[in-house]
């Protein structure tokens, strides 16, 4: 049996994007602050990441075009909800 996932995420690009957004405290706090005032959806998640990484890839070179934005949006939503409780 083989799996087509990467560390529980759809692919490496999605995992790496989530890793960058959640493993750097300053970036994580910036993300939380941004999404307290913005609707959490795929378009806004991608826009936020493009602001962070204008070259359209993570600092590790993973293309944002390959990211599963549904998973990133869910992760952001869960992070914001957890922080508010």
Predicted regions and their residues:
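Acidic interaction surfaces
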Residues: 1-85
